[in-house]
Amino acid sequence: MKYKRILLKLSGEALMGEQKYGIDSQVLIRYANEIKAIADKGVEITIVVGGGNIYRGIEAAATGIDRVQGDYMGMLATVINCMALQSALENIGLDTRLMSGIKIEQVCESFIRRRAIRHLEKGRIVMFGAGTGNPYFTTDTAASLRAIEIEAEVVLKGTRVDGVYTADPEKDPTATRYTTITFDEAYAKGLNIMDMTAFTLCKENELPIIIFDMNRPGNLLKVLEGESVGTLVKL
């Protein structure tokens, strides 16, 4: 395996499948099996899931809800998604722990860095819910922060597209996919890979990002085996 310890970032929208809202159980099962394939190879896995399939804090103002309140609602949405994925993983025999950026003691552990690393060393999959625990920070930023804290070797951003393109491939048939791009090049070209806070955290800590299609069977394992899948962003 090319990477020993990873952070996998999944969008909440990906869990919807073909639905317009909520969680598609078939997507959960498929993702769980993809994750099991790399867990069986001895990879230490941490996961951050977005909450956009349930609620987006940034949209709160449009509905008359205070932005900070909306962000906390979004954090709770990520915990719901983590719990759903946790169940899917445990149903196929994987040992997991869910850690939250806010205290929800009856449901999950609070995030403690040393404890998270110890769980990984014991072979458990660790999921990080509730973002950073602070409003105004995205789950991409939470993914970057947690990856740095637990000393992950790479952030794998599983999406519904197979990498980063020179232009929107749905609008421009001549668009080509980058196999590798530097942080500075991505910034100069205005490529929307992550929000700027998340992106800068990765750059300043020399943490590479791989953007790949999580919905293509076997892709996650291929990334870990070092195959040229998706787009690698590095210094």
From Swiss-Prot:
Transmembrane segments: none annotated. Pathway: Pyrimidine metabolism; CTP biosynthesis via de novo pathway; UDP from UMP (UMPK route): step 1/1. UMP binds at residues 51, 71, 132-139. It is an enzyme of class 2 (transferase). It catalyses: UMP + ATP = UDP + ADP. Its EC number is 2.7.4.22. GO terms for molecular function: ATP binding; UMP kinase activity. Pfam families: AA_kinase. This is Uridylate kinase. GO terms for biological process: 'de novo' CTP biosynthetic process; UDP biosynthetic process.
